Amino acid sequence: MIFRYWGATTDEINSSVVGDDLCADATLIATRSITISALPQDVFPWIRQMGFGRAGWYSYDWLDNLGRKSATRVHEEWQSVNSGDKVPSGPISFTAAIVDAPRHFVLEIKSFGKQSPKLHFTLAYELREDPQGTRLVTRMRSHIKLPFGSLFERFILGPGDGIMLRRQLLTINKHASPFSKGER
């Protein structure tokens, strides 16, 4: 699958990430990582403010933000997302399952039955201290219990998420770096 382990080390791929237990029966798992020349507390606000109608997703705005440009600075008014809050993603919303600033931010979607969901998706952002600043490790996990769910994961969700998340990580790196033109 394209970009399934983009930027991730073998240790990052094989280690656990906060939120792995939320979608423990995942049939698709992807780990993507990037090193950012900024401290975790300077990177985390960029992640916390994400969402449709908020800062956007820092990816291909024409696709995941209906053409509205993603934020190029940190907005204080979008820094109040806490565990249990909704994070809009267009017609549906994620739940901020885990928010532990400035280390962890985990988004989750569960639908079609809370006990045994037909669709379960998590996206974890783990900010690890690094000699160069921050190592941002992401982990996407999904399980789709619908007809052709595994085909959808393999040929659409996996590659699509890989392309979009790669762009997101590069954009966060660009904005959060102290040498970027993004404003703090």
For each predicted feature, which ranges?
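Glycine-centered loop/turn motifs
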Residues: 75-92
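Short Gly/Pro-enriched turn/cap motifs at secondary-structure boundaries
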Residues: 23-25, 84-87, 115-117
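Short, surface-exposed coil-to-beta transition loops
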Residues: 29-31, 90-92, 118-124
